[in-house]
Amino acid sequence: MVEKATLANGCFWCTETIFSRVRGVLSVMPGYSGGTIKNPSYREVCNGSTGHAECVQMEYDSTQIDFQTLLEVFFDTHDPTTLNKQGADVGTQYRSAIFYHDEQQLATAQDIIALKDNGFDNPIVTELIPFNVFYKAEVEHHDYYNLNPSQPYCRAVISPKVKKLITSHTQLLKEEL
């Protein structure tokens, strides 16, 4: 069964790159959610005036991977204890958030946060927000890492996250990688 998940954990280039490598994830689209204006641009979101988070919306086959496993990857590939910040990326657009699509996703998110919270030095600050609307990012942000692998941000920030995914979740990787 095809289901949707909408997750924010810093720069959407990172998040798209991670989840596009996970078996059972059918598609990953970078974009914006959680804000107050319609069809925001990257520039508007980055200046912090819209309230949107950079996020991804993915479609996944729930017969191959479940929402809990997606959240395991989510929490293992960013720091959910830093408020509105991931590394050098600072602002509400880089917050950690789960935009849940139904009550089951909410319950799963609450359960995994309760399980993982003791594993960090600081409390998890990931927001749980009912999903409302998702706006696709501009095309130049789609598949950014794969199209720009030698760009300094990709090498310094995204590549280490990919390595962490490979070492911590090898069994979840798509075979073609």
Which residues are covered by each model-predicted region?
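Flexible coil/turn and secondary-structure edge motifs
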Residues: 1-177
